[in-house]
Amino acid sequence: MTYQFVSGPSSLVCTETWHATTVVISCSGVVDMLTAPHMGQLVTTVLGKRPSVVIIDLTDTSMFASCGMSLLVETHEKLPEDAKLIVVADGPVTRRPLELVGLSAFLTLRSTLDEALEDVPLAEG
């Protein structure tokens, strides 16, 4: 399922794709204070479906503001203990900020979606 969030000059497109009990939320565009609340609502809806693994793919994200980082922390905190969050982030727009603020210490980061899917147990992905 694809969701498009447009708030003023900011635009974000998120797709939700399920692989058994694993969900991939792929984001393309700007994650800022205008679009992050919409992305947060999508994440909350997805968490209500009780996935065992949540992969947030930021590969095509062109801007990733601090509110996006806060959303990742909130998502990590909302997950049940037996669920896993994997963030796909690579490069100066996404991965570097996560490393600079120390979030890479407790978030599972992968450089590609394929790498993230390799972390999913076969029965779940």
Task: Specify the residue positions occupied by each region the protein language model found.
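Amphipathic alpha-helical interaction surfaces in cytosolic regulatory modules
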Residues: 33-107
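STAS-typified acidic loop motif
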Residues: 2-41, 60
